[in-house]
Amino acid sequence: NWSNSNTFVEYNSNTNCSTVVLHRTAIATYDHKNEALKLNSGGYTTNTTKSRLNAILSEIFVGACVFQKNFNWFFNYNNQTHDFNDGMIITEGGVM
């Protein structure tokens, strides 16, 4: 269940996408057809946003995570680390 007081999931049957919303910000959108996940902090690089993104990632791409070092966010998957960028798209093959 991905719903609580400040986080919920919306499914759009027209696009076949599920979107996780935190405080009115779409932080992740999963395209079920293409098996791709779009990440977005909405400019809120907080522990809560990072925690929600990591919870989503752990369900879809095992071993993927967002982490912070020296106040900067990074994304790690398949032993590759990338700068975290709003709008980055993750697939089984890595970052697009």
Sequence positions of predicted segments:
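Terminal leader/tail segments of proteins
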Residues: 1-96
